[in-house]
């Protein structure tokens, strides 16, 4: 690990880590979607790199839900996080000056989009949204882009008569709490179908190249051959890595450079923090999320 850290720092012109100006610790928030310990394990490599790069104690925080990370960023108790697009939209709408989007995960084909994937158990006989009529449908977290915002808007346009209210088209519509919870609930037969996120690239059997299904496969939670895709959203812009705007300029520059250069120096760490295979992270700006911000505004009316 020490050798890899040195290589990353050299690549990003951080060859002499010193106490970062104006801070005594750095706090990284990790969105929900899988159990807290797995999230902490996935981000441990980034925590170690950050501590070496900034020269201050670095802590990981894995709140129970998306809102815990969002409120941490807004309140100044979290300095950096990889948000979903909807989570970024909520943060921006709450306080436009709270955070800066700096980087985005890049797929193996060079794109930075992903999909909300609807899925069910193969042995249920459910193979489409049509077959979900009268069944139990699961969302993840209310602040998830792919686990709630986009499917709640797009699925009702699939055909006339679909709503996302319990007792109408679906027998029940419920929130499971996160992506992993939705996947496990469908796999166990606790709900009939649900939605999660994936880049939509690669093989179904692998859980695609990256996303919550890939993480679940890697963790041994599911066999994708037991599941079937029943719906797919239009492409969604991948959420941004954000930094708290009030951080010192040198800290923001070091952290942006560190993550931007991670793929070249430590592909295993990149795999861990990006939920599967990717080409690492590239710069992104606020303008990439204008459509999601508008969708979030409309949903709140």
Predicted regions mapped to residue ranges:
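Hydrophobic residues within well-ordered alpha-helices
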Residues: 73-74, 132, 186-187
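Extracytoplasmic small-molecule ligand-binding "clamshell" domains
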Residues: 21-89
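An extracytoplasmic/periplasmic, membrane-proximal ligand-sensing/linker region
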Residues: 23-30, 34-45, 51, 243-301
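A conserved helix-loop-strand patch within extracytoplasmic ligand-binding domains
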Residues: 104-163
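Pocket-lining segment of extracytoplasmic ligand-binding domains
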Residues: 142-248
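Beta->alpha turn/N-cap motifs
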Residues: 62-66, 77-95, 104-105, 179, ...
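Sec/Tat signal peptide C-region and signal peptidase I cleavage site
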Residues: 15-20
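Periplasmic-binding protein-like
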Residues: 24-31, 101-117, 211-247, 253, ...
């Amino acid at each position: 690990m020490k050798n890899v850290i040195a290589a990353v720092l050299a690549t990003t012109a951080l060859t002499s880590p010193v106490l970062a100006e104006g801070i005594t610790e750095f706090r990284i928030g990790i969105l929900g979607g899988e159990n807290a310990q797995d999230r902490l394990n996935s981000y441990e490599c980034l925590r170690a790199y950050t501590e070496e790069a900034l020269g201050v104690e670095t802590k990981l925080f894995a709140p129970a839900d998306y809102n815990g990370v969002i409120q941490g960023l807004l309140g100044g108790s979290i300095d950096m996080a990889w948000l979903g697009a909807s989570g970024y939209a909520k943060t921006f709408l709450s306080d436009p000056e709270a955070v800066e989007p700096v980087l985005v995960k890049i797929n193996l084909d060079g794109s930075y989009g992903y999909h909300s994937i609807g899925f069910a158990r193969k042995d249920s006989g459910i193979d489409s949204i049509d077959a979900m009529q009268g069944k139990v449908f699961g969302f993840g977290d209310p602040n998830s882009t792919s686990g709630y915002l986009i499917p709640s808007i797009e699925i009702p346009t699939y055909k006339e008569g679909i709503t996302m209210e319990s007792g109408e088209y679906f027998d029940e519509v419920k929130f499971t709490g996160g992506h992993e919870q939705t996947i496990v609930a469908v796999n166990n037969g606790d709900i009939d179908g649900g939605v999660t996120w994936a880049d939509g690239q690669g093989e179904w059997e692998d859980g695609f190249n990256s996303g919550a299904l890939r993480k679940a496969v890697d963790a041994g939670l599911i066999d994708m051959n037991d599941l079937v895709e029943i719906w797919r959203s239009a492409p969604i812009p991948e959420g941004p890595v954000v930094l708290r705007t009030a951080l010192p300029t040198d800290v923001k520059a070091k952290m942006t450079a560190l993550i931007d250069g991670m793929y070249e120096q430590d592909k295993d760490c990149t795999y861990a923090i990006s939920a599967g295979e990717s080409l690492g992270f590239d710069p992104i700006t606020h303008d990439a999320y204008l459509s999601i911000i508008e969708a979030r505004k409309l949903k709140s009316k």
